[in-house]
Amino acid sequence: MAFAAGAVVFPGGRVDPDDYLVARQHGPDVHEADGAARVAALRETLEETGLAVGWPALQERELADVRRALLAGTLLSDILAARGDRIALDSFVPFARWCPNFKEARTFDTRFYAVAAPPHGHELTVEEAEHSHIFWASAHRTLMMADRGEVSVIFPTRRNLERLARVADFDEFSAHSRQFPVELVTPWIEWCEGQSFLCIPDHLGYPVTRESFDRVRRG
């Protein structure tokens, strides 16, 4: 990836024009950008990992063919129309929206959603055009791996992992998310006692709202 190269990230990617069409056809009554981002989350997770979230009609034996079609450029709207399927965009729980400005060549307005993983028996495999490998791990374990230097975790990912690590399961996290607004988070720098800290608002459900800039750079 051009952004956060080598870092551990959640599945996801760019919202495509077709995602807006799918959101209008299948989406709940939400803002069009929110609906399209939910579609992108569904599509990118399937493309990148082979896991189908929010698509109850898609059988496990059909996953590989649908994934290949998406990766080959077939539009999701055409696949859904041909199959006559409905996707469950209301199953995606919005919990964060970040737009960091770290003086990168590009900035990313990124929406984060939680969704229940469906039961599955197949092995998830990486889509190698953008990622080197994938793995399942709890938020707590991933934070421990980062603290030991086994993986690199950028500032927004660490803050979201810390939120996830506070709860036991999807239902508990969904309830937690509903207690806080989803507002655009753009971190800023503050100085305190000769140190610089990267900070975020303290009313959005994050247990840690600042981190020393030296540690942020270390990832």
What are the roles of these predicted feature ranges?
Residues 1-219:
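N-terminal leader/linker segments that precede catalytic domains of diphosphate-processing enzymes
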